[in-house]
Amino acid sequence: DNSYKVSGGLHGVSVSVVNALSSKLHLMISRAGQVHEQEYQHGDPQYPLRVIGETDKSGTTVRFWPSELTFTQTIFNVEILARRLRELSFLNAGVRIVLRDERINLEHVYDYEGGLSEFVKYINEGKTHLNEIFHFTADTDSGIGVEVALQWNESYQENVRCFTNNIPQKDGGSHLAGFRAALTRGLNQYLENENILKKEKVNVTGDDAREGLTAIISVKVPDPKFSSQTKEKLVSSEVKPAVEQAMNKEFSAYLLENPQAAKSIAGKIIDAARARDAARKAREMTRRKSALDIAGLPGKLADCQEKDPALSELYLVEGDSAGGSAKQGRNRKMQAILPLKGKILNVERARFDKMISSQEVGTLITALGCGIGREEYNPDKLRYHKII
C-alpha cells in the first residue's frame, strides 16, 4: 500500500490508454509466488487472468504493439525514452533501470546511488562549479517529503528543475516558490551577518542570487493538486511552507558550516548585482542615444525607403568596406545596409551588461527597433521582416 501513497495518478490511466491504442497488449505479473498472465487485442481481453507458473520474484512485465489503425507512425525515439528513464533513476536513488533497443543492439543502464546529487553533477558536467553540491532530504510534519540538491557554477543562467512524485513541472509551482523564498532569505541573512552588503554597497535581488544556479527540487506529496491535466504546475498550497521550512533550516546550516563555499557564492551574487546595475545604466544610455540620433537610427545604417516592415530587408555586412559595396548594389526602395565589425561578441557566454555595452550590439538593437530587456522587448516593433 505504501507504494501508492505518493503516486502521480498516471500509471492506471496510462495502461488503459496504451491498451486501447494497441493492436496487442500482453501482461505478465509475478506476485505472491505465482505468475499471472493476460492478453488484450485492441483493448479487449482474449481470456481471463490466468496462472501460468510459480516464482519467488515480484514485478510486472507489460508488452504492447501500437495499433497501425490508429497511428501513421509507430517508431520509438530511443533518445526520448533514455532521457526520461535517466531522469527517473536520478529521482529514485538506488533504482536500476535498463533500456534495451533491440533494433540496433543498444543497451543503457541507469543506476545512480547519489540520486539528486548525481543529477546536479550530470547537468553541471563541463562547467566550473563554485561549491560542492548541497543535498538534503527531509520528511515534514505534514507528511510531505522534500529533497533538494543544488550547486552554483560560473555560467550566468539559472537552471532549476521541479518534480512532484517523479512528475516534472516545467512551470514550477508551490515547491519552487518555497525553495526560492528560503534560498533568498538564507543568502540575504548570510550577506547581512557578514556585513557584505554594506561593504560592497549593492542591493541584491532573488535573480542575482540564482545566477549560475543549478538545482533539483523533488517533493513527495500524498494528494498533489496541479493547475491542469498535464501537471505542469503544482498548486498544492501546503507544499510551499513545507519546502520553505526544510530548505531554510538545511541551507542556513550549510552556509555556516561551509564558510569557503558561502564566500564563493556571495562573490558570485555581488558580481551579478553589479552586472545588473551596469546593464540598467547601459540600457538607459542606449535609450538616450537612440532618442538623440536622427529618427533614432544609428549613423552607419543606410536605411531603405519602404516603411512597411513586411516589405523591408536588412543586410548585416562585415566592415565598412563591404558596407560601401553593398550600399552601391542595393535596391534603395526595400533594402537597408548595416555594416558591423566581424565576430563582435559571443553573447551566449557574456553577461547582459557586457553585451549591452558593446557598441556593435547597441547599434544592432537600435536598428532592429524591438527594444531590450524583459519589460521593453516587443518583437511587433521589428523594422525589418527579413534580416540577412
Curated annotation (Swiss-Prot):
Gene Ontology cellular-component annotations: cytoplasm
Enzyme class: isomerase
Residues annotated as site: Interaction with DNA: K343, N346
GO annotation terms (biological process): DNA topological change
Compartments, record wording: Cytoplasm
Catalytic activity, EC: 5.6.2.2
SUPFAM superfamilies, per database record: ATPase domain of HSP90 chaperone/DNA topoisomerase II/histidine kinase (SSF55874), Ribosomal protein S5 domain 2-like (SSF54211), Type II DNA topoisomerase (SSF56719)
UniProt-listed Gene3D superfamilies: 3.30.230.10, 3.40.50.670, Histidine kinase-like ATPase, C-terminal domain
Any one Pfam family match given in the protein's UniProt record, by short name: DNA_gyraseB
Record key words, sorted: ATP-binding, Cytoplasm, DNA-binding, Isomerase, Nucleotide-binding, Topoisomerase
Keyword ATP-binding: yes
Keyword Isomerase: yes
Molecular function as annotated in GO: ATP binding; DNA binding; DNA topoisomerase type II (double strand cut, ATP-hydrolyzing) activity
Catalytic activity, reaction form: ATP-dependent breakage, passage and rejoining of double-stranded DNA
Residues covered by the Toprim domain: 312-388
Task of the protein: A type II topoisomerase that negatively supercoils closed circular double-stranded (ds) DNA in an ATP-dependent manner to modulate DNA topology and maintain chromosomes in an underwound state. Negative supercoiling favors strand separation, and DNA replication, transcription, recombination and repair, all of which involve strand separation. Also able to catalyze the interconversion of other topological isomers of dsDNA rings, including catenanes and knotted rings. Type II topoisomerases break and join 2 DNA strands simultaneously in an ATP-dependent manner.
Note: Few gyrases are as efficient as E.coli at forming negative supercoils. Not all organisms have 2 type II topoisomerases; in organisms with a single type II topoisomerase this enzyme also has to decatenate newly replicated chromosomes.
Family, as annotated: Belongs to the type II topoisomerase GyrB family.
Subunit structure, as described in the record: Heterotetramer, composed of two GyrA and two GyrB chains. In the heterotetramer, GyrA contains the active site tyrosine that forms a transient covalent intermediate with DNA, while GyrB binds cofactors and catalyzes ATP hydrolysis.
Protein name: DNA gyrase subunit B
